[in-house]
């Protein structure tokens, strides 16, 4: 409460002028209110919105952080003006958010939009952080790309600049591909095949207007988008082949904008 009052004072705004408070949390959220076990914060299942609203005397809405970021990007970011879109965040893991008619699709259990845990391989032997095998996150995240690279380098002795690096990063792979390294280009193609195929599967279900790609891996830029779009088009109906792919633009502010939009949507 003290922190909220301090922020209002800094902005020269009275509490009466505030429509509500939006919060993004790293975990499933039901009914814009109940957090269903937020492991990263050490929370069990409880009604965050009701608890906080009683303390501050304002309406409170809660959303999954990835979903909230997606809402922000569709409102004021790379997907500005889009009412039906999907955001994919490629970082240490793979996150996502689905926006339909301008609102978050959270699902019955609050787990909607967990794109990173779509199964994309039946032959994977290593386990994902979620405990399953063959998740998209194991291939399209920054750590997944590094894993694929190490496997590729161990498979043969093909000449590549990546071998000279003490610790390969996803950025190294994309930079090498841009510089003409054949092995790196093959790796980018593989990431594009897997991610493009996964997004194609999403498209045949919800037919979004666009996909917004964010997270650290998205800094690779057009070389990533080109690889993804190529394989996306191979997976979808002809009418969906012109679905837009854009880069996210809000960075860490996406969640802030999304939290505000949650409140405006409800009011």
Segments from the language model and where they lie:
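ATP-binding/phosphotransfer module of carbohydrate and carboxylate kinases, centering on a glycine-rich
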Residues: 1-20, 29-34, 50-60, 72-82, ...
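Structural signature of FAD isoalloxazine-binding scaffolds in flavoprotein oxidoreductases
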Residues: 111-115
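A cytosolic small-molecule/anion-sensing beta-strand core signal
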Residues: 25, 31, 64, 100-101
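Active-site glycine-centered loops adjacent to acidic/histidine catalytic or metal-binding residues
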Residues: 65, 91, 259
């Amino acid at each position: 409460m003290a922190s909220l009052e301090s922020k209002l004072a800094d902005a020269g705004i009275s509490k009466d002028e505030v429509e509500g408070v939006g919060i993004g949390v790293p975990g499933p959220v039901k009914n814009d209110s109940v957090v269903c076990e937020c492991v990263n914060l050490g929370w069990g299942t409880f009604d965050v919105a009701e608890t906080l609203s009683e303390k501050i005397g304002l309406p409170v809405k809660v959303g999954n952080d990835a979903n909230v970021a997606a809402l922000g990007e569709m409102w004021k970011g790379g997907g500005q003006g889009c009412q039906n879109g999907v955001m994919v965040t490629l970082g240490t893991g793979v996150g996502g958010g689905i926006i339909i008619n301008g609102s978050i699709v959270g699902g019955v259990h609050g787990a909607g939009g967990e794109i990173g845990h779509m199964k994309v391989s039946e032959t994977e032997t290593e386990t994902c952080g979620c405990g399953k095998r063959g998740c998209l996150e194991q291939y399209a995240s920054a750590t997944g790309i590094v894993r694929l690279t190490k496997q590729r380098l161990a498979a043969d002795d093909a000449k590549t600049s990546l071998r000279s690096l003490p610790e390969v990063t996803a950025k190294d792979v994309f930079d090498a591909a841009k510089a003409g390294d054949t092995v790196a280009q093959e790796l980018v193609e593989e990431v594009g095949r897997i991610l493009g195929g996964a997004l194609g599967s999403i498209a045949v279900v919800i037919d979004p207007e666009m996909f917004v790609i964010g997270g650290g891996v998205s800094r690779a830029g057009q070389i990533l988008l080109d690889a993804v779009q190529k394989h996306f088009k191979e997976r979808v109906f002809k009418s969906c082949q012109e679905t837009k792919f854009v880069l996210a633009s809000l960075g860490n502010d996406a969640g802030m904008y999304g939290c505000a939009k949650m409140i405006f949507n409800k009011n």
